[in-house]
From Swiss-Prot:
It comes from the Bacteria. ATP binds at D11, S12, G13, N14, T15, A16, I17, K18, T128. It catalyses: (R)-pantothenate + ATP = (R)-4'-phosphopantothenate + ADP + H(+). K(+) binds at D125. InterPro entries: ATPase_NBD, Type_III_PanK. Belongs to the type III pantothenate kinase family. Homodimer. Pathway: Cofactor biosynthesis; coenzyme A biosynthesis; CoA from (R)-pantothenate: step 1/5. This is Type III pantothenate kinase.
Amino acid sequence: MNVSSFLLAIDSGNTAIKWGLHTGDQWLVRGSALQSERMVLKQAWALLPAPPASVLISNVAGLQAADDLTALLKPWYVQPHWITASASQCGVTSRYTKPEQLGCDRWAALIAAWYRVQRACLVVDVGTAMTVDTLSSTGEFLGGIIVPGPDAMKQALAGCAGTLAAPVSSCFQNFPVNTENALYSGMIQALSGALERMYRLLSSYSEKQTLTEVIMTGGGAALLAQHIHIPHRIVDSLVLEGLAIIAKSGNFDYNKK
């Protein structure tokens, strides 16, 4: 095992930070922390079996999160690389009008998904927001949608309707018979409906497109997966996988936060 090639990959999302130490072939250790508890990372990283030789970061949580991560990385004297989306990378090409404006987490997830399946698929990240992105059978990112995730929907309802916030005990019903279940079921229907509609759209995009599954990731993936009726798999830490693939390709040079 060549410790001089260890990569620390960091996925700094809106709510949580996921990280992993990669050997070039496999994950040696992985962990996570809430954005509100970033200093927990200092303790976790102090226990790493070896210092990273490189650091690759996907950050969508803003400049303060970037500054805090930079400070936490200083003891290793390693210059972190902050990825951005591009027109083409690691076999994936982008149709985005301005490719660099695509969220770097979405881009890393697309690269990981393409590396896994090499065919047309949906890449679904269920977090603070839910993104549903489309990949063609040739690795072309056709575009995608962004909708509020489960927690964001709950908070929005609580903010505008106070007592209408769905309690934890709410459950899904096809035909809800109380207000709490109506709110919860509506949230599930909205998210699963958006996902399944995108599935149908990609399926009809071209006769040559063959969808075999949906690749799901994010904190809300397991919840939503219970309510969709299309082939799918859940991949934990898909963004980290994408970062490891990008790092291994050597096709990056992003030092700006």
